[in-house]
Design a protein with these regions (language model features):
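Acidic/histidine-rich helix-loop elements
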Residues: 25-49, 78-83, 123, 127-132, ...
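Aromatic-lined substrate-binding rim segments of carbohydrate-active enzymes
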Residues: 49-114, 176-177, 181-188, 293-304
Length: 351
């Protein structure tokens, strides 16, 4: 158990401002066979990031962009140490646009060598938690990014090492994270890192990792899953039409108090001891009734405001987002050729 002094030492240096923003998906997939078979939206693959995304986020008052990336956008697992420079230049431009528009950029490995949260769908030739080769490749990539962006202040750029770790022990996860952080800090000692909690029935922080200097502890806002991923073909959720509050069984009703218990409380001790906490992903897929989604979002946003946690909606453009979400029950506004969910945007801007 990490002590309070260690946790205080591990908090993000200079306590970053409250970040509010979005996930941008251009590097989320590398080839059509990753997610596109389940949802055509995920067919957006290894494309350049889009400058107007940064401009619009800044115009609306947001200051954060998380880039969830598949390592296969820059490398082939058959030749993993050969890195495609063209892909890195795409990422360079996103980092530069972050500076231009005052938007913090967070690089994330959503698919790392040997691990994806969707392992059942996305087969890997290694296991990141047990295979040294996968761990060496993982550290090689993070060191490469650290060297490439050395000198860019952490106020502008952070590294979120692994998306939603699961199917591993806390000790296995800690070993991989510490190796990744060491590889980053060898090249760039001051780089801020973001560390996801372990995924299971609920998201739990690994308190020992909260003691890593200049780190942020990341959680999620996907609860209850039956509401946030209603009818999502990759999620296997019940077909019960969501309401908010939402009764899951005779004895369980999800409401604001349950959100606090399940999603805030596990991180409250760390936050009270000085750790910075951030919600790296959250949102509702487009089959959840719009009014229900907005009511649920308001409760989560108000809770995060109370504890001063920042957040990044999944996503800006797409089925969870404020642009081009393709909801059947929304009257969209034309925004430069895109369909804008103005009601959802204004709700986000309140907080």
């Amino acid at each position: 158990m990490a002590g309070a002094a260690a946790l205080s030492a591990g908090r993000a240096a200079g306590a970053p401002p409250k970040w509010r923003g979005f996930n941008l998906q251009e590097k989320f997939t590398a080839t059509p066979d990753e997610w596109a078979a389940l949802d055509p939206e995920w067919g957006r693959r290894n494309e350049p990031f889009v400058e107007t995304d940064f401009a619009w986020m800044a115009r609306w008052g947001f200051n954060f962009a998380r880039l969830p990336m598949s390592y296969r956008c820059w490398a082939d697992p058959k030749d993993p140490f050969h890195v495609a420079e063209a892909t890195l230049r795409d990422i360079d431009r996103a980092v530069d646009w972050g500076k231009q528009y005052g938007v913090h950029v967070c690089l994330n490995f959503h698919r790392a060598p040997g691990y994806s949260v969707s392992d059942a769908l996305l087969a890997e030739p290694w296991d990141l938690w047990t295979d040294k080769q996968a761990q060496d490749i993982f550290c090689f990539y993070w060191r490469r990014f650290a060297e490439r962006y050395r000198g860019i202040p952490s106020a502008r750029l952070s590294f979120n090492l692994i998306n939603e770790p699961s199917h591993c022990t806390a000790a296995q996860y800690e070993k991989v994270v510490r190796a990744g952080v060491d590889s980053i800090r060898q090249a760039d000692p001051e780089r801020m890192v973001m560390i996801d909690g372990l995924f299971g029935e609920a998201i739990q922080p690994v308190k020992e990792l909260a003691a890593i200097p200049n780190s942020i502890q990341a959680t999620r806002g996907y609860a209850p899953f039956a509401l946030t991923h209603y009818l999502a073909p990759w999620a296997g959720t019940p077909r019960q039409v969501p309401t908010w509050p939402m009764r899951i069984s005779d004895s369980v009703e999800w409401n604001r108090a349950m959100l606090e218990q399940w999603c805030i409380q596990p991180y409250r001790e760390l936050a009270e001891q000085g750790a910075t906490v951030f919600v790296g992903e959250w949102g509702c897929w487009n089959r959840t009734p719009h009014a229900v989604a907005l009511a649920w979002m308001r409760d989560f946003l108000s809770l995060w405001k109370e504890v001063n946690w920042g957040w990044a909606l999944w996503c800006l453009r797409g089925s969870f987002g404020i642009l081009d979400s393709n909801r059947a029950d929304v009257k969209y506004e034309n925004w430069h050729g895109h369909k804008l969910d103005r009601e959802m945007l204004e709700l986000l801007r309140e907080f």
